[in-house]
């Protein structure tokens, strides 16, 4: 579950991480009030107006602006709230901005130069360990750094039996080129950040940039946080941070009816039982020269109602040009699934305007094929995996 920057900073602050202070605002009037409050509490004269959406690259898209007075705070808040913000990480149409974070300006002059770093904590699925990834190249897309200057990215693997050790936090601060008070502050920052990651059951905490201020303080200027969905049952206060408006509406609907659905960019809709078979089906579609439009696991109870619901969800994606149903009948009987497909087709009528290819293998597969072939519906049936792929290719060629 992704959360907003301001929510991520709330979690960080609760674990002792120093963050750029800010107040969330839903309109220009609230933004001005927030700026006045920040000035009274911090003395800051300038403010940063930051769009709050679940995507990075907001600055490049015009979603982060500097306001030098209250009039600019009001003007920029009016400009950003309600806009369709397009970044490299949003859909082509962008995302609507519903709120902004009015933050203090932390790039003030002082005894030393400011420096920006990149620090993230995430799970390394290859090693099964948590990992801290960091770089001196803060404020940039880490993907660009990895592509052009990979030697500037460092990693620190964390042994799960002992957790983050002091020498590891010190090594990170050393590799970032810090010394004196800034070195000590970074060690504290890394320790608190890791504790926040573990304590919140997160799968990622990305801070970009981490700022060394001109008076040698270390603070989080941004926060991109993902909480593990499987742990939300024991993190109720973080579960309340969910913003459904930021999520794909089709995925939200599928989740509400118990379907495991992930929206993708292709043209071939998939309806499969079992995650492993679903991934294999997606591979087969790609080998056939096409792209899957979704990942959809209907689970072990693929009855008529569930199949019809899955059909309706898949067809909400206007990019779908064909649907491939691939079911292995173990616990589920193939003839029941086939009847569900036929019934769903009858119930939905003209709503289904794309070719449907059905491959059923396992319990009562022969009966299922007869049901489909004798239904009178324009449904193509296949026996072999490759045969199904060939039928998809023929339907879309």
From Swiss-Prot:
NCBIfam families named in the record: PRK00696.1, sucCoAbeta
GO biological processes: succinyl-CoA metabolic process; tricarboxylic acid cycle
Chain segments annotated as coiled-coil in the UniProt record: none
InterPro entries: ATP-grasp_succ-CoA_synth-type, ATP_grasp_subdomain_1, SUCC_ACL_C, Succ_CoA_ligase-like_bsu, Succinyl-CoA_synth-like
GO molecular function: ATP binding; magnesium ion binding; succinate-CoA ligase (ADP-forming) activity; succinate-CoA ligase (GDP-forming) activity
Residues at which ATP binds: 50, 57-59, 106, 116
Recorded superkingdom: Bacteria
PANTHER family attached to this UniProt entry: SUCCINATE--COA LIGASE [GDP-FORMING] SUBUNIT BETA, MITOCHONDRIAL, SUCCINYL-COA SYNTHETASE BETA CHAIN
Gene3D superfamilies: ATP-grasp fold, A domain, ATP-grasp fold, B domain, Succinyl-CoA synthetase domains
Lineage, uppermost ranks: Bacteria, Pseudomonadati, Bacteroidota, Flavobacteriia, Flavobacteriales
Pathway: Carbohydrate metabolism; tricarboxylic acid cycle; succinate from succinyl-CoA (ligase route): step 1/1
Cofactor: Mg(2+)
Keywords linked to the UniProt accession: ATP-binding, Ligase, Magnesium, Metal-binding, Nucleotide-binding, Tricarboxylic acid cycle
Role, per record: Succinyl-CoA synthetase functions in the citric acid cycle (TCA), coupling the hydrolysis of succinyl-CoA to the synthesis of either ATP or GTP and thus represents the only step of substrate-level phosphorylation in the TCA. The beta subunit provides nucleotide specificity of the enzyme and binds the substrate succinate, while the binding sites for coenzyme A and phosphate are found in the alpha subunit.
EC number: 6.2.1.5
Domain ATP-grasp positions: 9-253
Reaction(s) catalysed (UniProt annotation): succinate + ATP + CoA = succinyl-CoA + ADP + phosphate; GTP + succinate + CoA = succinyl-CoA + GDP + phosphate
Naturally occurring in which organism (per UniProt): Flavobacterium johnsoniae (strain ATCC 17061 / DSM 2064 / JCM 8514 / BCRC 14874 / CCUG 350202 / NBRC 14942 / NCIMB 11054 / UW101)
GO CC term (a single one): succinate-CoA ligase complex
Cofactor binding notes: Binds 1 Mg(2+) ion per subunit.
Positions of substrate binding: 273, 330-332
Binding site residues for Mg(2+): 208, 222
The protein's assembly and partners: Heterotetramer of two alpha and two beta subunits.
Name this polypeptide is given: Succinate--CoA ligase [ADP-forming] subunit beta
Family label: Belongs to the succinate/malate CoA ligase beta subunit family.
